Amino acid sequence: MPTFLAALLRAVLCLATLRAAMAAEPVAVILDHPRIFLTRAGLSALAARCAGAGAADYAALKRAADDAVRAGAIRWIDNKWAVPHDLLSCALVYLIEHQAGRPAQAYVDLIIRAWGDGTMIADQRGSAFGYHAIAYDWIHDALDPAQRRRYGDALGTWLTWYTGQAAITLQDGAWEYNQTWGPSHLNVMHSRDAITQKLLIALAIGGAGTAHQADAERFLASWATRIPNECIPAFDRMGGAWAESHGHGSYGPITVIPYAFEAWRTATGQNLFTAGRPWGFLPEMSHWLTWLRVPHTGRHAFIDDGGGDRYAGFASSAPLVARALRDPLAQWQALQARADGQYADGPWAALLIDPTVTASSPAQLGLPLAYLFAGAGNVFMRSAWDDPDATWAFFGAGPHFAGHQHDDEGHFLISRRGGLVGRGGGMGGNDEDFYWGGSLVFNLVTIFDPDEHPRRATRNENDGGLLRHVYEDQRCARGSITAYRDRATYTYSAADLTAGYAPAKARSVTRQFLYLRGRPGMDEYVVVLDRVVSTRAAFAKHFMLHVPAEPAQGGTVEELVPGHVARTSGVGLITTWLSRPDDFGPDAKVLSSGRSRMFMRTLLPAPASITRRGGEGHRNWGHPLEPTAQYDHTGPRRGEPPYCDWRLEVAAPLAEQTLFLHVFQIADEAVTTMAPVVLAEDAQAVRLEIGTVEQRWRVALAVSGDLGGSVTAPGMAEAEPLPVAVETRAQYAVDATPAP
């Protein structure tokens, strides 16, 4: 390379004046190509691996590229909703074949024919502009100077897409919003700031002599400043659970945020994966996507608008997270994805797995049996790893970060050999199914103010539940985990949910969730205490619970709608039902054996009235006290998984202050009688004795003041006080308390 040209490239690419918040030296983009995910220095090792231990992965990649060359076409390159995998397969095969000294131009020629004069790259009606940038970087050295400028100019037109600026603007979305980063197809739909696509372009075209060099520099400067100073702290606040759940997370952020951070790392040498706290989004992502897996299917739980998948977009990015963080859990998931055939359509991603990273399963790592993702307020619990028959539970309460989050604070799920406590069945979109954006698909307490007028009320009338923040873009308080501790025998969580309800009707709403973890062969229990204070005694309160199988009610049952609605009233009522192993639908293989049984003992209020409602035509009923909602809120996707066809409505006598106290027993299917439960009350606490004499738990939960109490496990003489603060030292060696 001529000296003057090398000097020019250094001048335009070296961001000498920029310093990331945690970098001691200026950040500079390397001169050579490839820069994105791969470097020239690493090509020889990659080529050697493709000829050795990675031969099977490379054979699949080359077969895809060769098929495309023979067909003379790149599949899906004009499909706006698909990833053009053949484009990347051809570009990567070119790099490896060229490195090995074999003919490789045919792969480049196919891409050049597809790109033509560059119009299809720059077409703002639809273009996978992020993936075109990766391919451009990978075949850069095979292009002549005119082609580099032509296609680089086409790519450069995207640097001001949507915002009108070649910079990160956060226009119409925060760091925690999926469209800020871009979708997994890296196309125009649902791309606002499109940070990932623009970063890939700015890194790819730098130094190519395009008309957009200044814009590329401006965008890189914006990234180098704003990501360390603003984005990383925001991700630390949010934590490892994507704010919009693994539903909208899988559509983009779980895949494309690691793309962006890894492209920056390989192009500059600055590893921003490690810039945040241990509980930040990227360091904790692999843990979250592991904890989401429900044992009886190995698939992600139906939480918020996500669920039913096994990887949620992580298959493509897990190799990048694993190598950037040396993360054994991400590597384990990448190898699982390869074994499950997740790279069949996109074999290029399998070649990014770094074999020097050790893979370890949760059991091999000795992960705890419970985990708090403090930013989102997500608590996961289980009885064992590597056991499809294990018990699994979720409890959540956290702030609203971004638009697509559903309002489900205080919601919980339980499974063992199938779903036991689920959310309202079926799926729906936020735009066409407003009922899905209300409270009655979740397991929480309603406070019915007949004069409340909620947002988004079309076919989603007053449900007595939480304020509806879905599709609001501003961060706001809804609920928070105020106490958490995990021990070998129990996991305890407590949440203040008051901010989630309209202040006109709720003075205080809290929920305490205590999972009593049994030893192998023992039954397990969950204790849930709700302390609810309304502004008026006339505001009726209900404890809502969704179950997948038709429950059997104790006491005298009054049939209101035969086969669908029945009511029983009394003190200490027991309700029971079986698990549903196929609750994830026919496409989800059931890994567990048999079924389990759940008993629910309603101890408070006393007396209580319990309505069982469900079955065909009654699955999605409105609130029982809202006259305009007395119909089945069905929709196009209500029959899809998760299957959860029944709802229990526990009604309390009218009073300003109400306690709901429930003990759930998780037992084998053959068990027909619930274990003994004895309740004693005083002004300070509810006190429980649960189980037989030989396996008796003693539990006390405070009914006023701090959300504390005590627990005594079977065989233990001394009660252990429950915490009134968050304890996460077992996770991080320090406690993670989310910033306000």
Segments and roles (model prediction):
Residues 2-14, 19:
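Sec-dependent signal peptide recognition
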Residues 302-364:
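N-terminal leader/propeptide and maturation segments of large enzyme subunits in energy/redox metabolism
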Residues 518-522, 646-659, 665-740:
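Non-catalytic terminal regions with compositionally biased, polar/charged low complexity
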Residues 34-285:
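Aromatic-lined, polymer-binding surfaces characteristic
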